[in-house]
Protein backbone atom coordinates (compact mmCIF):
# COMPACT_ATOMS: atom_id res chain seq x y z
CA UNK A 1 0.00 0.00 0.00
CA UNK A 2 1.21 3.52 -0.82
CA UNK A 3 1.27 5.31 2.56
CA UNK A 4 1.67 9.05 3.03
CA UNK A 5 5.21 8.34 4.22
CA UNK A 6 6.08 6.35 1.08
CA UNK A 7 4.66 9.10 -1.13
CA UNK A 8 6.70 11.74 0.74
CA UNK A 9 9.84 9.59 0.47
CA UNK A 10 9.39 9.33 -3.31
CA UNK A 11 8.98 13.11 -3.62
CA UNK A 12 12.00 13.70 -1.37
CA UNK A 13 14.14 11.23 -3.32
CA UNK A 14 13.10 12.36 -6.80
CA UNK A 15 12.42 16.09 -6.43
CA UNK A 16 13.59 17.57 -3.10
CA UNK A 17 16.92 15.69 -2.87
CA UNK A 18 19.30 18.62 -3.73
CA UNK A 19 17.80 20.85 -1.01
CA UNK A 20 18.87 18.67 1.95
CA UNK A 21 22.67 19.09 1.82
CA UNK A 22 22.21 22.85 1.40
CA UNK A 23 19.86 23.05 4.40
CA UNK A 24 22.24 20.89 6.48
CA UNK A 25 25.08 23.29 5.63
CA UNK A 26 22.96 26.29 6.70
CA UNK A 27 22.04 24.57 9.97
CA UNK A 28 25.61 23.53 10.77
CA UNK A 29 26.83 27.08 10.07
CA UNK A 30 24.80 28.13 13.16
CA UNK A 31 27.03 25.78 15.22
CA UNK A 32 30.07 27.83 14.18
CA UNK A 33 32.37 24.96 13.30
CA UNK A 34 31.37 22.59 16.14
CA UNK A 35 30.92 19.36 14.23
CA UNK A 36 30.57 16.86 17.08
CA UNK A 37 27.75 16.14 19.51
CA UNK A 38 24.15 14.99 19.36
CA UNK A 39 21.35 16.07 17.03
CA UNK A 40 17.61 15.43 17.23
CA UNK A 41 15.80 15.81 13.90
CA UNK A 42 12.13 16.32 14.81
CA UNK A 43 9.52 15.21 12.26
CA UNK A 44 12.35 13.60 10.35
CA UNK A 45 10.09 11.70 7.96
CA UNK A 46 12.38 9.54 5.79
CA UNK A 47 15.37 11.28 7.37
CA UNK A 48 17.10 13.29 4.68
CA UNK A 49 17.81 16.37 6.83
CA UNK A 50 19.33 14.28 9.62
CA UNK A 51 21.26 12.12 7.18
CA UNK A 52 22.72 15.19 5.46
CA UNK A 53 23.75 16.58 8.86
CA UNK A 54 25.44 13.27 9.70
CA UNK A 55 27.30 13.27 6.36
CA UNK A 56 28.56 16.83 6.87
CA UNK A 57 29.56 16.42 10.53
CA UNK A 58 30.58 13.87 13.12
CA UNK A 59 27.28 14.18 14.98
CA UNK A 60 25.18 11.32 16.38
CA UNK A 61 21.72 11.89 14.89
CA UNK A 62 18.32 10.74 16.14
CA UNK A 63 15.58 10.74 13.48
CA UNK A 64 12.42 11.39 15.51
CA UNK A 65 8.89 11.08 14.13
CA UNK A 66 5.38 10.07 15.18
CA UNK A 67 4.77 8.10 11.97
CA UNK A 68 6.04 4.53 12.24
CA UNK A 69 5.88 4.08 8.44
CA UNK A 70 8.18 7.08 7.97
CA UNK A 71 10.63 5.60 10.48
CA UNK A 72 10.68 2.24 8.68
CA UNK A 73 11.69 4.10 5.49
CA UNK A 74 14.21 6.14 7.50
CA UNK A 75 15.82 2.90 8.74
CA UNK A 76 16.32 1.73 5.12
CA UNK A 77 17.77 5.12 4.20
CA UNK A 78 20.19 4.95 7.15
CA UNK A 79 21.36 1.51 6.00
CA UNK A 80 21.75 2.63 2.38
CA UNK A 81 23.78 5.62 3.57
CA UNK A 82 25.98 3.28 5.67
CA UNK A 83 25.40 5.50 8.67
CA UNK A 84 24.03 2.91 11.15
CA UNK A 85 26.84 3.71 13.58
CA UNK A 86 25.80 7.37 14.00
CA UNK A 87 22.14 7.67 12.94
CA UNK A 88 19.14 5.94 14.57
CA UNK A 89 15.36 6.32 14.70
CA UNK A 90 13.04 6.99 17.62
CA UNK A 91 9.23 7.05 17.65
CA UNK A 92 7.33 9.83 19.40
CA UNK A 93 5.51 13.15 19.41
CA UNK A 94 7.43 16.43 19.63
CA UNK A 95 5.06 17.51 22.40
CA UNK A 96 6.50 14.84 24.70
CA UNK A 97 10.09 14.03 23.80
CA UNK A 98 11.22 10.84 25.58
CA UNK A 99 14.68 12.12 26.51
CA UNK A 100 16.03 13.75 29.69
CA UNK A 101 16.71 17.47 29.98
CA UNK A 102 19.80 18.68 28.11
CA UNK A 103 20.27 15.65 25.84
CA UNK A 104 21.02 17.32 22.49
CA UNK A 105 23.48 19.87 21.12
CA UNK A 106 21.30 20.54 18.10
CA UNK A 107 17.57 20.18 17.42
CA UNK A 108 16.48 20.51 13.81
CA UNK A 109 13.08 20.33 12.20
CA UNK A 110 12.14 21.01 8.59
CA UNK A 111 8.61 20.94 7.18
CA UNK A 112 7.02 19.56 10.35
CA UNK A 113 6.18 22.49 12.66
CA UNK A 114 3.06 23.36 10.63
CA UNK A 115 1.54 20.02 11.68
CA UNK A 116 2.22 20.24 15.43
CA UNK A 117 -1.01 20.48 17.46
CA UNK A 118 0.38 22.36 20.47
CA UNK A 119 3.31 24.34 19.10
CA UNK A 120 4.05 26.11 22.41
CA UNK A 121 4.34 22.79 24.25
CA UNK A 122 6.50 21.42 21.41
CA UNK A 123 8.94 24.34 21.45
CA UNK A 124 9.19 24.22 25.25
CA UNK A 125 10.02 20.51 24.95
CA UNK A 126 12.72 21.26 22.37
CA UNK A 127 14.20 23.89 24.70
CA UNK A 128 14.12 21.37 27.59
CA UNK A 129 16.07 18.68 25.70
CA UNK A 130 18.64 21.16 24.35
CA UNK A 131 21.97 21.20 26.14
CA UNK A 132 23.31 24.50 27.44
CA UNK A 133 25.00 26.11 24.45
CA UNK A 134 22.80 24.05 22.11
CA UNK A 135 21.03 25.31 19.00
CA UNK A 136 17.53 24.83 17.62
CA UNK A 137 16.79 25.37 13.91
CA UNK A 138 13.09 24.89 13.15
CA UNK A 139 10.88 25.79 10.21
CA UNK A 140 10.75 25.17 6.53
CA UNK A 141 12.47 25.98 3.31
CA UNK A 142 14.16 24.74 0.16
CA UNK A 143 17.73 25.94 0.65
CA UNK A 144 17.80 28.88 -1.75
CA UNK A 145 15.71 30.59 -4.43
CA UNK A 146 17.11 28.55 -7.31
CA UNK A 147 16.30 25.26 -5.56
CA UNK A 148 12.86 26.53 -4.55
CA UNK A 149 12.11 27.46 -8.17
CA UNK A 150 13.20 23.98 -9.30
CA UNK A 151 11.01 22.29 -6.64
CA UNK A 152 8.01 24.54 -7.47
CA UNK A 153 8.31 23.75 -11.15
CA UNK A 154 8.54 19.97 -10.62
CA UNK A 155 5.82 19.88 -7.94
CA UNK A 156 3.43 21.95 -10.08
CA UNK A 157 3.77 19.34 -12.81
CA UNK A 158 2.29 16.72 -10.44
CA UNK A 159 0.05 18.93 -8.25
CA UNK A 160 -1.47 22.13 -9.62
CA UNK A 161 -2.39 23.21 -6.05
CA UNK A 162 1.23 22.97 -4.84
CA UNK A 163 1.87 26.71 -4.48
CA UNK A 164 -1.44 27.34 -2.71
CA UNK A 165 -0.85 24.47 -0.26
CA UNK A 166 2.78 25.48 0.34
CA UNK A 167 1.79 29.11 1.06
CA UNK A 168 -0.95 27.99 3.48
CA UNK A 169 1.46 25.75 5.40
CA UNK A 170 4.32 28.24 5.52
CA UNK A 171 2.75 30.94 7.73
CA UNK A 172 4.63 34.20 8.24
CA UNK A 173 7.41 35.65 10.38
CA UNK A 174 4.89 37.51 12.59
CA UNK A 175 3.10 34.23 13.42
CA UNK A 176 6.41 32.69 14.46
CA UNK A 177 7.39 35.75 16.55
CA UNK A 178 4.02 35.62 18.36
CA UNK A 179 4.34 31.88 18.89
CA UNK A 180 7.83 32.15 20.38
CA UNK A 181 6.72 34.91 22.76
CA UNK A 182 4.34 32.36 24.37
CA UNK A 183 7.16 29.87 25.03
CA UNK A 184 9.97 29.73 27.60
CA UNK A 185 12.48 30.72 24.90
CA UNK A 186 13.46 34.30 25.59
CA UNK A 187 16.01 34.92 22.87
CA UNK A 188 15.34 33.81 19.35
CA UNK A 189 15.58 34.90 15.73
CA UNK A 190 12.97 34.44 13.06
CA UNK A 191 14.68 34.58 9.70
CA UNK A 192 12.78 34.83 6.45
CA UNK A 193 14.90 34.87 3.32
CA UNK A 194 15.68 32.77 0.26
CA UNK A 195 16.44 29.83 2.55
CA UNK A 196 12.85 29.81 3.85
CA UNK A 197 11.22 30.71 7.16
CA UNK A 198 13.17 29.53 10.19
CA UNK A 199 13.20 29.96 13.95
CA UNK A 200 16.73 29.85 15.38
CA UNK A 201 17.65 29.90 19.05
CA UNK A 202 20.59 29.03 21.26
CA UNK A 203 20.12 27.84 24.82
CA UNK A 204 22.24 30.17 26.91
CA UNK A 205 20.34 30.05 30.21
CA UNK A 206 17.73 28.04 32.08
CA UNK A 207 14.20 29.47 32.08
CA UNK A 208 13.16 31.10 35.36
CA UNK A 209 10.83 29.18 37.74
CA UNK A 210 7.76 31.20 36.62
CA UNK A 211 8.45 30.17 33.03
CA UNK A 212 8.22 26.41 33.82
C1 LIG B 1 6.45 16.99 5.45
S1 LIG B 1 7.24 15.78 6.45
C2 LIG B 1 8.88 16.47 6.55
C3 LIG B 1 9.92 15.39 6.66
C4 LIG B 1 11.36 15.86 6.71
N1 LIG B 1 11.64 16.70 7.84
C5 LIG B 1 11.80 16.55 5.44
O1 LIG B 1 11.95 17.79 5.46
O2 LIG B 1 12.01 15.88 4.44
C6 LIG B 1 6.58 16.14 8.08
C7 LIG B 1 6.89 15.06 9.12
O3 LIG B 1 6.56 15.56 10.43
C8 LIG B 1 6.03 14.49 11.20
N2 LIG B 1 5.25 15.05 12.32
C9 LIG B 1 4.11 15.79 12.24
N3 LIG B 1 3.69 16.12 13.47
C10 LIG B 1 4.58 15.59 14.35
C11 LIG B 1 4.67 15.59 15.78
N4 LIG B 1 3.76 16.20 16.52
N5 LIG B 1 5.71 14.95 16.35
C12 LIG B 1 6.63 14.30 15.59
N6 LIG B 1 6.59 14.26 14.23
C13 LIG B 1 5.58 14.90 13.62
C14 LIG B 1 5.19 13.71 10.19
O4 LIG B 1 4.92 12.40 10.63
C15 LIG B 1 6.06 13.78 8.95
O5 LIG B 1 6.92 12.67 8.84
Show which residues each predicted segment covers.
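A conserved beta-strand element that flanks and buttresses the S-adenosyl-L-methionine
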Residues: 108
